[in-house]
């Protein structure tokens, strides 16, 4: 199963992004395919926060547009939501301790822990910060 990071979701949604064509095509490929693909809850939260933020985008996506986009992804038959469960904390704790993770990097550790807990084969991301988590395979689908 492939999970999709925040930046790829943002690129797929924001037509003004230079990476929109590739990002939209890749997410559409997952959404229209039969194979299960994953959306970590933190990535959806971050997506909403980023695309509706007026200091990041001018104009930002309207709330109804961002909510509609999330709804569309969640309505695909092959989408799986990655949420915290009983085994999440031990996994996150190990990642934090082993990688000496603190500060803002904790947000990436949360996503990594969710992916590892749910058996994700690869996280699609354009963010190199995930290399801090060697147990998580990352792929940049834009290159």
Q: Residues of each region from the PLM?
A:
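Acidic, PIN/NYN-like endoribonuclease modules and their adjacent C-terminal/linker elements
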Residues: 1, 112-143
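Active-site neighborhoods of divalent-metal-dependent phosphate/nucleic-acid chemistry enzymes
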Residues: 60, 78-122
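Alpha-helix capping/helix-boundary segments
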Residues: 8, 43, 87-88, 110-111, ...
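Short, conserved active-site loop motifs that form the nucleotide-linked donor/cofactor pocket
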Residues: 35, 79-80, 136
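Short, well-structured N-terminal submotif of metal-dependent ribonuclease cores
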Residues: 1-39, 54-68
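Short beta-strand segments at enzyme active-site cores
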Residues: 38-42, 125
């Amino acid at each position: 199963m492939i999970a999709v990071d925040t930046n790829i979701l943002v690129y797929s949604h924001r037509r003004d992004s230079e990476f929109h064509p590739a990002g939209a095509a890749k997410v559409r490929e997952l959404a229209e395919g039969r194979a299960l693909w994953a959306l970590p809850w933190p990535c959806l939260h971050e997506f909403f926060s980023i695309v509706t933020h007026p200091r990041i985008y001018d104009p930002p996506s309207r709330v109804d547009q961002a909510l509609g986009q999330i709804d569309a992804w969640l309505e695909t038959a092959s989408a799986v939501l990655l949420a915290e469960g009983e085994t999440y904390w031990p996994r996150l704790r190990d990642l934090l301790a082993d990688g000496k993770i603190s500060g803002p990097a904790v947000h990436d550790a949360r996503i990594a822990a969710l992916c590892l807990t749910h058996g994700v084969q690869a996280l699609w991301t354009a963010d190199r910060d995930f290399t801090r988590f060697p147990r998580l395979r990352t792929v940049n689908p834009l290159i």
